[in-house]
Amino acid sequence: MAYVDYSSNYMSQIPFRTGFGYDVHRLSDGYDLWLGGVKIPYEQGLEGHSDADVLLHAVCDALLGAAALGDIGVHFPPSDMTYKGIDSKILLSRTCTLVREAGYEIGNIDATIAAEAPKINPHIPQMRRVMSEVMGIPEMDISLKATTTERLGFVGHREGMEAYATALIAVKGAF
């Protein structure tokens, strides 16, 4: 496996960049359900090394990917006990700092959560508020959607949840 040096000071000549993120976690008893930095009432939660906020993890990967800074596992590895049980809002905040330190501004986020239950839509306004505060961008620049998988696959069988996210960033001053 080739080693990729994400510490390069190289700045792309492309003023606008997009990134894509994906994350998945298993639903299990004994965990709280955190999505978009919001605790959602439900009988199960997502299992993971951190608080397993599948949405915020996908957003982190989208932002890091857009800036060519690797992925969430590179910066916050599950092998590091510092991140055991960590609030994913902290990871998102640190990710935004990394992106800004690399010379970029965050434009917008578009993300989708796939879950059979519970209903996610009632919680989206609060998720957008929380993410806006953590990321330092306007709520109107954060689009969140929820869908089911029509009872297909592990998500449809209520075994887990997944999230997809895209991010637009730009070289500072391009917006």
Regions found by a protein language model. Name each.
Residues 124-128, 158:
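Short, low-complexity, polybasic intrinsically disordered segments
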Residues 144-148:
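Pyridoxal 5′-phosphate
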Residues 10-125, 135:
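RNase III-family endoribonuclease catalytic core
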Residues 155-174:
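C-terminal edge-of-domain segments
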Residues 151-153:
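Mobile acidic interaction elements
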Residues 138-141:
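Short acidic capping loops at alpha-helix termini that bridge into adjacent secondary structure
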Residues 1-10:
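N-terminal amphipathic/basic-hydrophobic helices that include classical n-h-c signal peptides
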